[in-house]
Amino acid sequence: MKWITLICLLISSTLIESRIIFKRDTDVDHHKHIADMYNLLTERTFKGLTLAIVSQNLQKCSLEELSKLVNEINDFAKSCTGNDKTPECEKPIGTLFYDKLCADPKVGVNYEWSKECCSKQDPERAQCFRAHRVFEHNPVRPKPEETCALFKEHPDDLLSAFIHEEARNHPDLYPPAVLLLTQQYGKLVEHCCEEEDKDKCFAEKMKELMKHSHSIEDKQKHFCWIVNNYPERVIKALNLARVSHRYPKPDFKLAHKFTEETTHFIKDCCHGDMFECMTERLELSEHTCQHKDELSTKLEKCCNLPLLERTYCIVTLENDDVPAELSKPITEFTEDPHVCEKYAENKSFLEISPWQSQETPELSEQFLLQSAKEYESLLNKCCFSDNPPECYKDGADRFMNEAKERFAYLKQNCDILHEHGEYLFENELLIRYTKKMPQVSDETLIGIAHQMADIGEHCCAVPENQRMPCAEGDLTILIGKMCERQKKTFINNHVAHCCTDSYSGMRSCFTALGPDEDYVPPPVTDDTFHFDDKICTANDKEKQHIKQKFLVKLIKVSPKLEKNHIDEWLLEFLKMVQKCCTADEHQPCFDTEKPVLIEHCQKLHP
């Protein structure tokens, strides 16, 4: 595992001027043409991607209508691969695609706004189409019996219908991801149609598939959030950390090349240039396999797969084993008297070999970025002091202690989860975050706590050396979504600081937040709590939700309550529920007991 060298590489990557990487089509115009994409893929895959893209742009059109357009585009693409290609074939694929849409008279009839879009020139035309996409998550799925019958008779029709529904309901989802999900859906259908209880199988497996879909979409949106809200050095540093984690073998030059190419295609994706994005992603897979021997011992299995499957395999590939010869002690970077001389030469450490230890658990990319920032600050301070080695000699201890603290905090949370279970762990998170952000709505706070508990359930179950990357990576995505929703008006100054100060420190900033001292709790009145007999007939999940709403209300009116007092009042609440739900008349009992509970709560109110 690499710590300090990755930190040094992250610093250098932000200071090195971006250079030309793997050769593009031409130095003047690197836009891809339709024949390029067609030649990269099989015809089946090309048509699948085209269907996904037209479904994202023309969301109201039926599958039958779009299939005709897909066939026209496919036929044209095929003609562009031959000797008789027309000048149109040389247009950038994005331009050609929107030319085809605008030339279809049905588009103008069904989409009135398209007339305005089609009057524009690219890239404004493409931006106009994207601006009119509607975000609705209401896919139409056939019943299990119908699905199995269609899959048996016409499997391609079923999979095309899935592409259409998934793409039009997720108009910004990376189109190859739509095809990946379609492939997984096909395997799901094949499996469930063999099961006796098809309804149960489809319900469970589709839930898993949709969770995977949302995870892919969340990660894609998170990258774009970084691109749109932080300097480019942040996304580059994050990509370099990821490349260096996955491929510990290559030298910095090769790692930096892959970082640059990855950053380039992510920016194209986030700016809406989906065609450039797709072809660059596929080309990156090609380049990865061309350098597989230099990169990783584990790439062989991916590079033997078809291109689309190969890309997903590479993205999800486990980290390669760290070569033993790369290990160097951390003291090389904090006790070397010549560190400042090396830093002054080019503000980077290109020749330093990685320091790593296979016995030490993996660190998260967020930790590496934050440490890089702190290490850079340390050198900028110490290298201008009277005695630089004396100034930076404690740097190793600082990094080690911070890492130990993070591992300890993660272990503490996993221990709570394992000891008390997900629901009580969720309540623990609910208490923490209600105190940090009491201005947030009850339902939103409950939703955040539930998602955090899900992350804990997942990440605490992985091997220990994967826990920090898992937990901090997923939590950073969740917190980023929360910050994005609040960016126009933050709910308090402390949240605003965490969301806008530093990407790498965002998660740790939220963790360190205490109760919002500026918050003035509302008075406790008859309207503060609402109890009715619905809780007596609710199922277990509904009862848990009602209890959590009471918990949030309690914290909001008494944010300084200690944990033991919170537990005490939750117990009082449960006693009231038990008493009233066993009474002959439920609601009169709640009406009688409510003032007693409120009176106690008022005594706790500051």
Swiss-Prot record:
Any Pfam family the entry gives: Serum_albumin
PANTHER family: AFAMIN, SERUM ALBUMIN-RELATED
Keyword presence, Mitochondrion: no
Tissue expression per record: Plasma.
Binding site for Cu cation: H30
PROSITE patterns: ALBUMIN_1, ALBUMIN_2
Key word Repeat present: yes
Span of the signal peptide: 1-18
Disulfides per UniProt: C80-C89, C102-C118, C117-C128, C148-C193, C192-C201, C224-C270, C269-C277, C289-C303, C302-C313, C340-C383, C382-C391, C414-C460, C459-C470, C483-C499, C498-C509, C536-C581, C580-C589
Entry-linked InterPro entries: ALB/AFP/VDB, Serum_albumin-like, Serum_albumin/AFP/Afamin, Serum_albumin_CS, Serum_albumin_N
Protein keywords: Cleavage on pair of basic residues, Copper, Disulfide bond, Lipid-binding, Metal-binding, Repeat, Secreted, Signal
UniProt gene name: alb-a
Function: Binds water, Ca(2+), Na(+), K(+), fatty acids, hormones, bilirubin and drugs. Its main function is the regulation of the colloidal osmotic pressure of blood.
Annotated compartments: Secreted
Propeptide: 19-24
Organism from which the protein derives: Xenopus laevis (African clawed frog)
Any one GO molecular-function label of the UniProt entry: lipid binding
Domain named Albumin: residues: 22-211, 212-401, 402-599
Family membership: Belongs to the ALB/AFP/VDB family.
Species lineage: Eukaryota, Metazoa, Chordata, Craniata, Vertebrata
Listed GO CC annotations: blood microparticle; cytoplasm
Chief site of localization: secreted
Protein name: Albumin A
Annotated SMART domains: ALBUMIN (SM00103)
